């Protein structure tokens, strides 16, 4: 009888050991190489990625490149040497980073990009919005607003990020629509370089140089926050601003009537889908090469559902 109990106990211990081993084997380590961790859009990507990693029992390590392409290259070297199971990339320089993406692929480390689309290469998937199409959608919204609220005439300035391929696509899409309207006069583009302080200075220069400017299009979160702050600092509360990516500042400006509309992405979903894609890939599965995430134009009419995320 005692031997029977011992055999049962040994079997239970062995089963538990197998279960523990299986759980340990399931957990993977993924590296998220971020653009920066100061802008809420990027931190939301990180939050979504962490949520998916927690669900899958994976470990997520995050590297903040602080807007530096060379830092991202160095991070690739480190994570390849550490033999992580996969890399998620929010690229500062999509073209320049491809050497590192190829090195990771050669080392057997799959790469999934988020936000900025990479050139053709060995990356396994890209998760992003259609930036040019969304720019066109905002352009159509802007033209309709000008017709209904400004007698069909407006002067337009752009606070962009000329170092960002995806923000150039947003600008291109927007201008392809607004440029075809004879009532809209474009006065110029200033470069905020996707850095909030620089976007503020660029926005101030745009407003100072164009005292009759009455509308601004901002192509990203730093550009939008910079444009809002620039208009406030110069007492230009009549200027109507259209842009990308909600923030606490953008919400307050929507309430004040300064910001008319914002293209809102789902960065948390982008990060979430990236980890899920890597988990599928490293388990022998397949994913779509391009995974699109939808956008929504946010105005006073539908902003309330977003408030909780920016308190």
Briefly describe each language-model feature range:
Residues 2-9, 18, 23-311:
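A residue-level marker of the well-folded mature domains of exported/periplasmic proteins
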